[in-house]
Structure formats: structure tokens, C-alpha cells
Amino acid sequence: MAAVSARRMLLPLSLVIAVHAAAGAQGAAPTQTTPSGATAAWTLRMKGDIRWQQVTPAGALLVSTDAALSAVDIERGQVTWEKPELGGLPPDSVRMVGGSLLMEAARPGLLLIFDPVTGSVVFDSRRLNLAQIVTRRVLPQSGTLLVHGRRTPGGGPPVVALYDLATGAQRWANEALFEQTEPQKKGLGGLMQRLVTAASEATALEVLQAGPDMIVVHTLTGLRALDARTGVMRWSATLPTARAGNPARHVRLYPSLDKTDRIYVSFDDRLMAYRLADGQALWTKPPTIEGWVHGIVQHPSGIIILPESPPANQATGNVRIINGVVQTGLNVARYEDGTTIVDKPLRMRGTVTDAMIAGGSAVLAVDAESRTFVNVLDVATATLRLKKDVKIKGQLAYAELTPAGLLYISRPDPATNAEVNVIDLASGEPKFKDAIESGKPWGGNPDDYNAARYSLHHAVEGTTLYVFASHDHRLYAVDRNAGTFRALGGEIKLQGDEDPVDMEIRPAGLVLIAPQNLVVVARDGQVKQQVYYPAPQLPGLLRALHRLNAVRAGLYGAAASAYGDAFAQASRNATDTTTRRLTGQLATAYTQGGAQLQGYASQSAALATKRFKASLATPGSVFMLTRAPDGNGNVLLQIDKDSAQPRSRVDLGKEREPVYAVDDIAGMLFLRTAPGTLVGYRL
């Protein structure tokens, strides 16, 4: 599946489900076996016509009727709660709250955030008379939800409030967070103070969960640490900007991965470490770079400070502009005192979007002039291993240093396709004269469910990197040590004008998965099994299947956030191979260490933890939706990845647009069989 870009943590492809659509097999297919009908586990009659339904990351099934929004226990088939005030909402008005198990429902004048398992309302915008929600952040370590909002005109000052995740009780509300901590100035200085305060009230807070007892926030008026239980300010700090008194811009907060006594704060062109206990700066002065700070990477040999190219009219200092791009400079700071390993920042062409850790080095991805360049940074010496940056197609997605050099895979962007190649570190030249390439560039639509078809799908087994290239529809094997590649077998053409959206290694061979195709390929490139199921005529029918990946991603985000802010930031930010270590640590903590998704109601935490453990197993099947054999209605098939045969099937009836939902973690399908009747099938 197309990997979700994050800077420090990429969930392994084995943990991200490939879900797709397609029944009535055609084309090059093996002898078909008759799938067994799915077993109806329960039947439930709702109060009113069922409009839509959706599975939540926590495991509850939300069902909407004109009368109410209800939750159904998927194991027992029983309604666990109802909310009449949320009846008749369109499906897009009920959404997951990122990095949590919670859901939110919105309608004009109302925002509700609730626990889908217990039905507890954690936040109701009417309680504080809020007209606008500026910031909302779930903090599972302290079991809270932080909300920052602005009231209706005349309704009072902006407020920051904290709510208990389990009960919805308000722990505290703070209306003084945006007040100036400096003495009140007169004249122009006072005007500037008031302007900064007004802007701060309308700007989303930077929030960091610093353990179970402390929350650190940044507003335009400064850095504040709040007691998570009472909301009392423990300490405040003013960021040391280049010109004293100027508010810091582009502020980001980072947890320390290895030193629990501190946090890191980047702002403008600099970085500072602060002691959590009292907010004291741990370094004499902040290390600086050229450009804005885009992010940091905490490498064992130092903190890599990634630069971002500012707009030319906002650049400060000694500005260098080439071809309309403001040039930048990267540096590496020491953990002990913040001093930089080299005096002058290393010159970069533009924004360094990523630094993928590879042993003692980091592979840099640089965005300049709408093109991507790569280089290799030796972190301990803060030097570049390539004499000049190497331009690649697309955007960097995967990189590793091998005996042959820098092996990389890119992903397509709106203008360029993707490629696989190896860069010789001595010469700086690519080893493959004709790189392995994908087909068309990605169209640029983030809502395109089939965007993954434009990527180069790959899988590693031992010293071999398998790559499927949609450019010529062939499977390639790259020797990671020798830096060579060869084509395996002949062209693998999918039917229905499709390309694979995922590939994985299984005992039977390599499996190529597309919305309506599944192909099992031997390791020598020979096709063992291939099936194709024509798509239903209405694309909207596939929405429930496309949602499966979002549900899994939501569950992983909640697990990462509950385990710690370092994992939460990693899951939000990154794309590199070092994140396998973090992901493995996270999985081990929940499966062997007995960790729970803390902070939520016990019932919700237990159910979500059980689902998270179950989700770690790579699914052995995919779901495909297709037209019924007689052409009247639709059928959902569960296709085995190893045999390419249907395991089970469910007839979705004769409706043009059946109302159904699938939970691949629990192995269930939920179908409206009559206007007010819901049936749960065990697959």
C-alpha cells in the first residue's frame, strides 16, 4: 500500500493492510473452487432506516439512522448506546480523532468528541460556549483531551481546557494562558504586545505530552509547562530569538528519545534544549542553521538539524538564492552542550525533507526547484560523503547503505515517476544505466484511492530486493550486496487496466494485489495463480473497503500515542528504515510487555489493545467486491493470498448501493438486509 509519509516512523508494510475490491472471475485464472457462504453471527433490528455504518479503530460499529447515532457491539450484535442528537448526520460528519481511539461528530454550532465504545462524551463545544476550536489534542499518557477554543463575541476570553478521557469531566480551564508574562509596555511596544496576544489566541498550540503529569505548550507569547492535573503553570520560558522581544516563528516541540530530563524546541533558525523540571535552558546558546528549522533527527552521534528554505521575501541573514530557491545550511549539534560539530552549516540546495538513518550515516533528501536530490551525511564528522548531490526521479521513499553503495527507491510525485537505483559512493554516479522505473507520475490527488498503483512496490528477502515495475509490468530482483539487478520471467499484465497497489512475500511466492486482481508469482517470475473480478459499476460501493486501511492506521496511531509522545510524533512524521526498530519496540511492548492503551476507559482500552495485538498478524486474504454472476446486485469475496481462491462470499443483495462495512481485524462484515435490519457475518 502506498506508505504514509512520516519522518521518523514508517509502519512496516506487513502491518498495513492492503484492501481492495472485486466476483465472477475472468481471464487467466486457476480452477475455481466454490466459496463457502459466510456465517450470520447475529441479526439486529434498529430504530429506523439504516443510512450508513462505519467501523472505528477501537472496534465499535457506528450505525446511523434518522433517529440516532448508535454503537453496536460487534461480537454480540447488541446496541450499547444511542445519541438521538446525532441522528441523520451525513457520514463525513463523523470522523476519527487522529492519534486516538476517539471519534468526533460535527454539525452547525456543535462539535462532540466521544468514546465510541462507551458512548461517553469527552467534549461538547456548548459547555464552554465555543464558536471555534483552534486546537484539540488527545494526551493518553495523562488520560486527557486538551482543547483550545475561541468563544462567541462577548462570550469571554479564549480558553484552554483539559478533559478526562474516561469520564468526560473537565479537569480544569485556563483563560490566562495567552497573557503576556513580560511587563506591560507603552506606546508601540504595547501595541505589538496586544497584536501578538491576539494572533496567539487564534493560532493552534504546539503541544507536547511530557509524561503523565506535565503538558508543555507553546503560544506566540512563550513556552509554558502546565500541571496535567490542575492546569497550574509550573514554569514559563522565553525563546532566545535572534532579536530579543520578537516572537519566535515556526516553533516545534520534540520529546527526547534517550534523555528523559529534557525536551527540544526548534524555532526560526535555531534549536534549544530545556530541562523539564524547571524550564531552564540546558545550553548556553542555541545552535543555528541557515534557513528555517524543518525538523530534527536524533542520531546517536548528534542532533541533525534539518533546514527549510524560506520564501525569498522572508529570508534573513546572509541570503543566497539560486534559480529562485533560497539556499540553506544543515548542522549537527552535540547533546551535551548544543555546540555544533562544524562551525559553518553545510550548504544545501533547499529544504532537507528527510534524513534517513543508516548506521553512522544519514541519507539526506533535498527538495529544490521541484526536484529531489540525495546525499549521504557522516553524522559524527558532519561531512558529506558525495562530492555533489545526486538528482533522482520522484521523492525519496526508501534508502539503505549496502556494500554496493546507496540503494534507494523513490515514490512518484505529480510530475515525475519513480525509480530504483544504486549510487556508487566513490564516483557519485548511478550504477544502473537504465533504472527500474514505475509507469505514470502520480496525479497529485491525495483522495485517489488508487494512487498506490503509481508506486514501485517492493519487498526484501535476504539479500534480494524484489521490485515490480508498472512501466513494463515486470518483476525484478535486485542484489543488495552486488548492486546488480535482473528481470524475472516475462510481462505480468493485469486485467481491467489495473496496476498493483501492493506487493508482499508469502510462502507461495510474491503476491501482487490490485483493486480487482490478485496474482501469485513464483520467485523466478513465473505466474502461479491469477484471478480477476470485474469491478462494480458504482465506484462509491468500494468506499467501505478503502476505509479498512484508515481504520488500521487510526489504531496504530492510537497505540503509538498511548505508548509515548516519541512514538506519536514518529507515527505522524516519517519515512525510513530505522523506524522498524521503533515499530518493533512498540509491537513488543503490547504483545510481550503487557502494555495497554492507557488513558481511556478500561473497557475501551482492553478492546483496543486486543485489536492491536490481532492486527500485527499479516492478513492472509483480501476483500474484493464485484457484480453478482447474474449481473443483478453485488457480491463480496474474501480471496486467499496464497491460493488466489475465494475463502468465503456474501451476497450483498440487489440494491444498487448496499449499506455495508467490513472489519478485517475481527473478520466480520456488517450488512443492511432491510431498511432497519443489520446482520453481522463472520468471515
Regions found by a protein language model. Give the residues of each.
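N-terminal secretory signal peptides that target proteins for export/translocation
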Residues: M1-A6
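Bacterial N-terminal signal peptides
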Residues: R8-H20
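Secretory-pathway ectodomains
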Residues: A25-L683
